[in-house]
Amino acid sequence: MIPKDELDKAVGIAKKYGVGELYLIGSALYKEPEDVSDYDFAVRDVPVGRFFRFYGELLRVMSKNVDLIDLSGKMTKFKNIIVKEGKLIYAKTSA
């Protein structure tokens, strides 16, 4: 599993960019941190024009390379699997 400080970084960046939901997916869910080559995330409801800035900051701040999948738009079978099998690590709440 990804270390807590790395999760905290990703969540902080998600909040900064107004992300709706952030999921941890892939090998970081079940492998030991030293066995993970990169972090895989999926994101939903990123405000228009912020996706690449959000992704760029993740790439700069995280200790490993990052892959990011955009779940916005029509839900497909692939996206449904990601949501079902991934771990929701952040969800924006209505204030």
Each model region followed by its residue ranges:
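Catalytic core of pol beta-like nucleotidyltransferases
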Residues: 1-23, 29-35, 44-95
